[in-house]
Amino acid sequence: MEQTQTAEGTDLLIGDEKTNDLPFVQLFLEEIGCTQYLDSFIQCNLVTEEEIKYLDKDILIALGVNKIGDRLKILRKSKSFQRDKRIEQVNRLKNLMEKVSSLSTATLSMNSELIPEKHCVIFILNDGSAKKVNVNGCFNADSIKKRLIRRLPHELLATNSNGEVTKMVQDYDVFVLDYTKNVLHLLYDVELVTICHANDRVEKNRLIFVSKDQTPSDKAISTSKKLYLRTLSALSQVGPSSSNLLAQNKGISHNNAEGKLRIDNTEKDRIRQIFNQRPPSEFISTNLAGYFPHTDMKRLQKTMRESFRHSARLSIAQRRPLSAESNNIGDILLKHSNAVDMALLQGLDQTRLSSKLDTTKIPKLAHKRPEDNDAISNQLELLSVESGEEEDHDFFGEDSDIVSLPTKIATPKNWLKGACIGSGSFGSVYLGMNAHTGELMAVKQVEIKNNNIGVPTDNNKQANSDENNEQEEQQEKIEDVGAVSHPKTNQNIHRKMVDALQHEMNLLKELHHENIVTYYGASQEGGNLNIFLEYVPGGSVSSMLNNYGPFEESLITNFTRQILIGVAYLHKKNIIHRDIKGANILIDIKGCVKITDFGISKKLSPLNKKQNKRASLQGSVFWMSPEVVKQTATTAKADIWSTGCVVIEMFTGKHPFPDFSQMQAIFKIGTNTTPEIPSWATSEGKNFLRKAFELDYQYRPSALELLQHPWLDAHII
């Protein structure tokens, strides 16, 4: 039993748990001289600060506080508790903001201490030494590794299966010691690039570089720990939270002493080459060695010279301005050269210009090599007057005014293979360059295991066209999810990939439109089947969403309009894409939409339009229309539904039905459930989506009809 002394000197006995908080209400009423109401407060159980601070006029009248003066005193005092609470919250917020500010400042100072230069990364070698490497201008993993390999001591170079020393980048790996999981993390290529170019990743000061046949040694791990402790030491200046990190590090050090660290990402080799970015053409032109790391440098230089000359010939013969959108390396370099020359000419005095300048000569494009003589120059001397090579002949001769201009882009007879920039439905996509013209390309490639598989040529085009429907029907029978499944061997799957690639080639030959990726041709070489496609600098809708988040509605309407224009063109050609989704919509750096990946597209003919056969289940599940899921019809209206799903992607940053698995999504779509329309879309945008998601495909509008929708007219930008 607790005893409390009151102001009058009498003892107040509190004998049960219900009245444990009486001292507060009693002191509250005593302070303002209203103790006569104490019994009323106790009877209504208004005894704590939380209950008293919410008192109002009506409650006080109900408690029997009838005097206005008493009510005012009680209310004024109770409201002061709320003010005190708000002041306390504000002070706590200020303290929190000060801590965050000090954390940011300390982190910056820490980074500047550990990584003195902005573009530098510290690599730890297996002998425990460390190398600081400037990665400025290296935008893929191969170029970063290549820059370090040139500085490796001979004893740390990798050896191949024949025991020979190798400097090939694929023979080296990069690890980072993850102290939170106590594992050695084997970095994917994209992880390495991200860490090297991020300003806030402290791992960039302790990357471990080893040959592929080795794992990080104890010396390398020890050096990594020392650098990590320096990081913790810098963090310890921020606040008490760093003490936990220090304690954690001690535990890790103890655990590491007991045994070997576990290596994470052991399955890295499966996707180590995927670097899903499409940099601008001008970016590539300034870092050719980085984007074509496996290409012989002399061959690359020869291609650059020929491309530059080719562009100069056409520019003079046609008197054409150089296109700002060209993907031709020669055009880009010539444009840069002309821009510099023009700036120099404008700075000359007009009188000196007329007397000293010979306008019949074209200035040569020459770039000096960097100070580092060991570094392979990324800027090439394209026109050298002193060069005695056979291919360096002067192209301003007797026939300089007779120029043969190509009417269309021909299939490249020789091309250079660059970095992997993505993957499609079948095979990988690489950056490529026409070795003769310097034109950049995206090359879709799949390995051919069966030598009797050939690429259709113009001579057998008609035969392939006649057999196309039969092959397509057979392919659909194999791929049909709803059909009875048979065991699939690797050979059958591989054959399907090659068939799909040939099918895509047959379709792309017929397509010539601004919003469809351009087809340059195909070839079969070195056990690979290649499709040469237009290189679209920028990226896909899905990659943009991953990088930047959902789009503004005005941008969505702009992209949707272009998608529908491309879809309308396909439908006019009786072609159904069947895989319209964000990953297959490319956006170049000028905002132009390009539809790509026709691996499962279908060309309708009058014959299969009339056939009443079960449709195949083809496409990406979350973008499928009800008639495709139910396998009731194969019509162009499926692309309209998928386009609506892409609009949902752009609004939300996620695919439709993001909370469901593929099987759950199939069930939802099959039971006539439409994707949820974003509540923040405009009324016209919602109406557009409702029309695109019309369940009955016969009433669903066509692409041309949707292009006339008011939503697309209201936001023309």
Swiss-Prot record:
Gene Ontology molecular-function annotations: ATP binding; identical protein binding; MAP kinase kinase kinase activity; protein kinase activity; protein serine kinase activity; SAM domain binding
Name listed for the protein in its UniProt record: Serine/threonine-protein kinase STE11
Modified sites of kind Phosphoserine: 323, 465
Functional description taken from the UniProt entry: Serine/threonine protein kinase required for cell-type-specific transcription and signal transduction in yeast. It is thought that it phosphorylates the STE7 protein kinase which itself, phosphorylates the FUS3 and or KSS1 kinases.
Matches recorded under Gene3D superfamilies: Phosphatidylinositol 3-kinase Catalytic Subunit, Chain A, domain 1, Phosphorylase Kinase, domain 1, Transcription Factor, Ets-1, Transferase(Phosphotransferase) domain 1
Catalytic activity: L-seryl-[protein] + ATP = O-phospho-L-seryl-[protein] + ADP + H(+); L-threonyl-[protein] + ATP = O-phospho-L-threonyl-[protein] + ADP + H(+)
Residue ranges of every copy of the Protein kinase domain listed in the record: 415-712
Keyword annotations: ATP-binding, Kinase, Nucleotide-binding, Pheromone response, Phosphoprotein, Serine/threonine-protein kinase, Transferase
Native organism taxonomy: Eukaryota, Fungi, Dikarya, Ascomycota, Saccharomycotina
Positions with a binding annotation for ATP: 421-429, 444
PANTHER family (UniProt xref): MITOGEN-ACTIVATED PROTEIN KINASE KINASE KINASE 19-RELATED, SERINE/THREONINE PROTEIN KINASE
Coiled coil: none
Positions of the SAM domain: 20-84
Region (Disordered): 452-481
InterPro entries the UniProt entry points to: Kinase-like_dom_sf (IPR011009), Prot_kinase_dom (IPR000719), Protein_kinase_ATP_BS (IPR017441), Ras-bd_By2 (IPR029458), SAM (IPR001660), SAM/pointed_sf (IPR013761), Ser/Thr_kinase_AS (IPR008271)
Active-site residues, record numbering mapped to chain: 579 (proton acceptor)
Family that this chain belongs to: Belongs to the protein kinase superfamily. STE Ser/Thr protein kinase family. MAP kinase kinase kinase subfamily.
GO biological process assignments: cell integrity MAPK cascade; cellular hyperosmotic response; invasive growth in response to glucose limitation; JNK cascade; osmosensory signaling pathway via Sho1 osmosensor; p38MAPK cascade; pheromone response MAPK cascade; pheromone-dependent signal transduction involved in conjugation with cellular fusion
Annotated EC: 2.7.11.25
More info: Present with 736 molecules/cell in log phase SD medium.
The keyword Ligase is assigned to this record: no
Comp. bias intervals (Polar residues): 452-466
UniProt key word Phosphoprotein: yes
Gene: STE11
UniProt-listed Pfam families: Pkinase (PF00069), Ras_bdg_2 (PF14847), SAM_2 (PF07647)
Subunit and partners: Homodimer. Interacts (via SAM domain) with STE50 (via SAM domain). Interacts with PBS2 and SHO1.
